[in-house]
């Protein structure tokens, strides 16, 4: 009988990608199948994130919930991976001695052998090393899970922003060879994937080796991706403004598959705070890049990351951020109150912004983003949008759900056979977190099919 695997994932899209690879590795090597709950699992894996406040506490809280399972069934193996595991290493296992495996983002490919070692030797295994590109060489064949997929093209970051742990937990920048990336995307396209999201902690810094020994940047890589049969949409994340080159801007002009949506973290609109964060760019430089992009793609939607209450942030600094949001019209964001990450330079700075001030600033910022989003959503009502149908609606299984090019969720009535297809939907209503629409046609192999004909689609 197959063993059961349960994976809990905290954090970013890269962690989601890594968790999917853990699942694939163990399904291939040890014939595991996914458990519906931790209680029925033989192996419990926690893939952790160290970006947000109290990341360690969240990890140990989750492990505490799993501890009774281990006490009842000592043969259950508990593993902790991801960035907190990389930070804590052996200290994590000492604090939670019932944890059997501690592994970093760059050693997840060793999970099958670590699992075998734990079971044979009956002692914990800790491996948080950084074995460069080896991780990608050892991963199983890609497996599609719906019409869109994440594809990791590089890992790590060498920017060392003062608030960020990524260089310490994911290591320096490592790019996959171009042929390896394209082979993975071809395999996914053959399984029905229509949209790929190219991932990296600093994806703009991609420098992959070509078959002839040359080097490809992200712009060139996306030209190769666009040539893959079946891939109709390309996204990429996460970007650093410093690495956003003219070649990358020109890719928005030359590659129609590249969507008119960009996540470009700025963190703050204050030059003084940007210097303290060691971001390497100014407010004006950031705005100039966005202006160039919007000359090429006037309908480009923009999302960002913001940190409020960074050490030393004054009212004036915060107002600079609010003004930037107003000027550039960000309509989506990941925004957080500053919390010091252990071992980073910002952790040594005086955290002198009162908690109540931080909370008030965050509330104002998020309200402004929500207001921008509402205005853009309202402006889309009556428009016809191309939507990639991802599945059924989370709130109504009788409806379908998909995303527009500008990353808006749209729910509408339609036949489940449309999942995985691009459809044309007229937007009828804008809601706080989604849009509602009416199906008006299906784009299928370059033909237009009316809604009455959707039963013909296999």
Swiss-Prot record:
GO terms for cellular component: cytosol. Gene3D superfamilies: Methylthiotransferase, N-terminal domain, tm_1862 like domain. Keywords: 4Fe-4S, Cytoplasm, Iron, Iron-sulfur, Metal-binding, S-adenosyl-L-methionine, Transferase, tRNA processing. [4Fe-4S] cluster 1 binds at residues 12, 49, 83. Residues 143-375 form the Radical SAM core domain. Its main location: cytoplasm. The keyword tRNA processing applies. It catalyses: N(6)-dimethylallyladenosine(37) in tRNA + (sulfur carrier)-SH + AH2 + 2 S-adenosyl-L-methionine = 2-methylsulfanyl-N(6)-dimethylallyladenosine(37) in tRNA + (sulfur carrier)-H + 5'-deoxyadenosine + L-methionine + A + S-adenosyl-L-homocysteine + 2 H(+). Residues 3-120 form the MTTase N-terminal domain. Its EC number is 2.8.4.3. It is found in: Cytoplasm. [4Fe-4S] cluster 2 binds at residues 157, 161, 164. It is an enzyme of class 2 (transferase). The keyword Glycosyltransferase does not apply. Pfam families: Radical_SAM (PF04055), TRAM (PF01938), UPF0004 (PF00919). Residues 378-441 form the TRAM domain. One of its GO terms (molecular function) is 4 iron, 4 sulfur cluster binding. Monomer. NCBIfam families: miaB-methiolase, MiaB/RimO family radical SAM methylthiotransferase. Catalyzes the methylthiolation of N6-(dimethylallyl)adenosine (i(6)A), leading to the formation of 2-methylthio-N6-(dimethylallyl)adenosine (ms(2)i(6)A) at position 37 in tRNAs that read codons beginning with uridine. Belongs to the methylthiotransferase family. MiaB subfamily. This is tRNA-2-methylthio-N(6)-dimethylallyladenosine synthase. It comes from Methylococcus capsulatus (strain ATCC 33009 / NCIMB 11132 / Bath). The gene is miaB.
């Amino acid at each position: 009988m197959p063993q059961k695997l349960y994976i809990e994932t905290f954090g970013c899209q890269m962690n989601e990608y890594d968790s999917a690879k853990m699942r694939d590795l163990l399904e291939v090597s040890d014939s595991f199948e996914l458990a519906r709950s931790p209680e029925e699992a033989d192996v419990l894996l926690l893939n952790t994130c160290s970006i947000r406040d109290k990341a360690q506490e969240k990890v140990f809280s989750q492990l505490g919930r799993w501890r009774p399972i281990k006490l009842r069934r000592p043969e259950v193996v508990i593993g902790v991976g991801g960035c907190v595991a990389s930070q804590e290493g052996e200290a994590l296992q000492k604090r939670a001695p019932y944890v059997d495996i501690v592994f970093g983002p760059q050693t997840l490919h060793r999970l099958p052998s670590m699992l075998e070692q734990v079971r044979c030797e009956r002692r914990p295994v800790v491996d948080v090393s950084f074995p460069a590109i080896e991780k990608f060489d050892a991963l199983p064949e890609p497996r599609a899970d719906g019409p869109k997929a994440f594809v990791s093209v590089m890992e790590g970051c060498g920017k060392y922003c003062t608030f960020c742990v990524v260089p310490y937990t994911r290591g320096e920048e490592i790019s996959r060879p171009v042929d390896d990336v394209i082979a993975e995307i071809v395999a996914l396209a053959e399984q029905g994937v229509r949209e790929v999201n190219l991932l990296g902690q600093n994806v703009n810094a991609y420098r992959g080796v070509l078959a002839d020994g040359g080097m490809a940047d992200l712009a060139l890589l996306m030209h190769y991706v666009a040539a893959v049969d079946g891939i109709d949409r390309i996204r990429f994340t996460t970007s650093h403004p410093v690495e956003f080159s003219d070649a990358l801007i020109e890719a928005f002009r030359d590659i129609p598959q590249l969507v008119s949506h960009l996540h470009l973290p700025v963190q703050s609109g204050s030059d003084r705070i940007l210097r303290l964060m060691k971001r390497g760019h100014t407010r004006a430089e950031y705005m100039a890049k966005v202006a160039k992009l919007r000359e090429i793609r006037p309908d480009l939607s923009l999302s960002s990351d913001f940190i409020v209450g960074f050490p030393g942030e004054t009212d004036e600094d915060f107002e600079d951020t609010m003004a930037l949001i107003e000027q550039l019209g960000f309509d989506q964001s990941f925004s957080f109150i500053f919390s010091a990450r252990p071992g980073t330079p910002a952790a040594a700075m005086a955290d002198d912004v009162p908690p109540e001030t931080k909370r008030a600033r965050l509330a104002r910022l998020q309200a402004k983003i929500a207001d921008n989003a509402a205005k853009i959503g309202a402006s889309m009502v009556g428009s016809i949008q191309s939507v990639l149908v991802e599945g059924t609606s989370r709130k109504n299984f009788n409806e379908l759900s998909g995303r527009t090019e500008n990353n808006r969720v749209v729910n509408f009535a339609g036949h489940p056979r449309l999942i995985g297809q691009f459809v044309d939907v007229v937007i009828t209503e804008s809601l706080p977190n989604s849009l509602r629409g009416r199906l008006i046609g299906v784009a299928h192999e370059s033909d237009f099919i009316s809604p009455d004909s959707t039963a013909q689609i296999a």
